[in-house]
């Protein structure tokens, strides 16, 4: 009888131990290992051109003459600081034209102009000579049937080196503005099928361009 009691006691102890192990709270989740985010080299950093840079001392809106008619345009700002370039600003009819960034350049075109029949593009070229680049820049915009360099010209209050070119479908104008470490390019493009008022408005915007820094 004593042996039976001892065996029952041992069995009870084993059951209790097993029960304790089963009911023991599970360990909390392991803390995630600390990860180091990859650091992009300078050339691979996502660019932010539009809306960046120092805020210029210019009004938020300005009346701009467009082909003899006054238009109220809104201030657009940007900076090419990530490319070693200056800040810039200009006035644009934001109710008609959209502002976008592509391949390190800013493009202004109508929302309903899917074919890009008229647009204004502003870019920065680190280390480039404005006068030299004026002779070749338009080759980046298609097969140029004919081209003419204009020498030193004015774009609003800025001095630039100009060029004009023609492709099968479009006419192009380029203005290369010297800066401290390179030059800024301003390119106007318009197709013969696009209303002249589109080009006139974009040219008026380009003539309000200011560069700082």
Question: PLM ranges: what are they?
Answer:
Residues 1-46, 163, 173-176, 185-188, ...:
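Gram-positive cell-envelope targeting signals
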Residues 74-80, 104-106, 154-164:
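Short, hydrophobic/aromatic-rich segments at coil-to-beta transitions
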Residues 77-132:
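Secretory pathway targeting signatures of secreted, lumenal, and periplasmic proteins
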Residues 94-95, 112-115, 156-158, 177-184:
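Short, solvent-exposed coil/turn segments at beta-strand boundaries
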Residues 183-213:
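Surface-exposed amphipathic alpha-helical segments
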